[in-house]
């Protein structure tokens, strides 16, 4: 009886013994098969030969599977080659990305340091300007009735503001360059993320296992067994045909049965199989023993024809299933290759944009270096302005100390002049007294016209401040607290100068 083929390449458990008929163990004397039964067996055998289509299909499946095996090997090789190339190019891209990021971070750090130094310089300048702003010019230096003014009122602040505006423009340009570079990096990162995602999905779909070799082995086993089964059916048909030939009236009965099939039965064509005349057959008659042996084998095989046909179809169905699995696997490999090729296409696009990303880094660095030079120049000017204001404030304190020194000098001169006048006045009084005493002692004896100046008073001396030709006034008088504060600041400056 037929059994479904469960193991790959398993041999059929259904066989028709007419392939190489073994000698029967015993024979039944007088075994005969009715002509009607022989005709039925022949027609059934002829119908079974239509199963040759399953064998043809089996051969087609095996050929297709072999082609699929070759195609799968090519697809896997191409996919692995692309994946290997993508992997290496990804490493190169990541190195370039690291370099670009270094340029960006280095520029940011340098920019931050420059801004820090600039802020510090501006803060120092502003502090100095605030000191000028808070230092009021002593009223003693200014015309009477003038509104109070600070030191900053006597200098032009527009230069500082213009310098600050220029620095703001430079900083804005640097930020724009940084933003443009940052946008380029974000685009680069987006490209790399897309590549990583696509490549990750591509590798996830990749599998080194292929079911095709095992399936092909099974398919070849089925095809070989089906060919063997078909050969058995063909031998059985030949045996049936031989039995008809050696049975009187067999040809006529076959033609009649083929021409008038029972209702629902599949028509069978026997043209080309049966000769037109039994008399045309010139064959040696069978011995009784050969006839009985033939009928015994025929009867046994006829009972298994339907099972053999069923097994052929079962094997074909299993082959179709495995063939579908093979085609699905090849389709999966093709899809995987297409996806990998798509990733590679994306990679090509990234490499087309790569020079732009690299040039963005070079442009950012060049622009920043140029801007940094201008910022440093402006920063030096700020520092120069601060030093000018510092010297201005220091000079004002020096002016106060100088005025104080002059005041002290004038006071000393005035004191000396006062003391001198006191001595001169004493000498004058003594001179007057001496002159009077002389006149009293000798005045009666000396003629008046002998020395007309004998009666003159002594000359008088006077010490006074001589104003200059331009009518300059005396040194202004400063409050002691003002002088003290200036002296304190000046001493602090000298101390800081020695420390530095």
UniProtKB/Swiss-Prot annotation:
Disulfide bonds: none annotated. It is a peripheral membrane protein. Residues 1-19 have a biased composition (Polar residues). It is found in: Cytoplasm; Preautophagosomal structure membrane. Residues 491-500 have a biased composition (Basic residues). Keywords: Autophagy, Coiled coil, Cytoplasm, Membrane. GO terms for molecular function: molecular adaptor activity; protein kinase activator activity. The keyword Coiled coil applies. Residues 157-181, 292-322 form a coiled coil. Autophagy-specific protein that functions in response to autophagy-inducing signals as a scaffold to recruit other ATG proteins to organize pre-autophagosomal structure (PAS) formation. Modulates the timing and magnitude of the autophagy response, such as the size of the sequestering vesicles. Plays particularly a role in pexophagy and nucleophagy. This is Autophagy-related protein 17. It comes from Botryotinia fuckeliana (strain B05.10).
